[in-house]
């Protein structure tokens, strides 16, 4: 029984670009969607994750809200009373004006996207789950001295290349690295997502990078939010807006020599101290947790449906 004055829970489908089944478990988008769905449910909503195969299914007609996490695949909203929301979390260059116009609302994981005004996009940055990614996820400095988690994306990713050129020995988890590195440098092709919080929290340093176009448009990587929430030391390539969110706690480098200086010294000297990192972790958990994103999405969806 609903309490008087309380709004009816909305039925949500959160659509990802990932395939269904076990294959989808290896996609970060799947875990992102699961954490968001949990946050929506915790705020009284009905929600489920939908893989790319069900994105345009007739089953979406039974939803109140469909939220599409836009990655590599375009999803065309179905006509009808369902409210369709688009959240551009990666590859913003693929989103065209006609696609954006087909949605009731568009969100972008950047506060600095040059096309936000053109497309009517509302800034909504990436997020983390502080129940999983927390300072208690692992003992500091008990894991990999230098850690990188990510596939090659078909290239020798610059931050890994630069780190190795400095003489550093990063521990690599990801697909495709055998084309660039000797096999002994590769820990595994896949690090299970439920092991990721401990890996970040226990690492000496976590390496982060962005696609160049995403860095230029301020689409900050999800890895930054997850790793920062654990209190990890992080070094990243520069990205527009990174300092606005993470301050000077996340170190950035513009030239290989700068990275060599950061990785070659004592981490205690090269990075802010643990108190500063935990201060950032607390702020990220509060301001950039999935609970905050769910509240914003619910408020926006309800407003659209009232209008």
Give a label for each model feature.
Residues 72-169, 177, 288-292, 305:
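Catalytic core of nucleotide-activated saccharide and alditol-phosphate transferases
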Residues 264-282:
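Conserved donor-nucleotide binding/catalytic region of nucleotide-linked donor-dependent transferases
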Residues 96, 193-196, 224, 259:
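Acidic, amphipathic alpha-helical patches
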Residues 1-83, 114-115, 237, 242, ...:
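N-terminal pre-catalytic "stem/leader" segment of glycosyltransferase-like enzymes
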Residues 193-194, 206-225, 229, 236-239, ...:
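Nucleotide-sugar-dependent
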Residues 23-31, 38, 130-202, 213-214:
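Conserved catalytic-core segment of nucleotide-activated headgroup transferases in glycan assembly
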Residues 58-60, 98-99, 198-199:
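Structural alpha-helical scaffold elements that stabilize or flank donor/cofactor-binding regions
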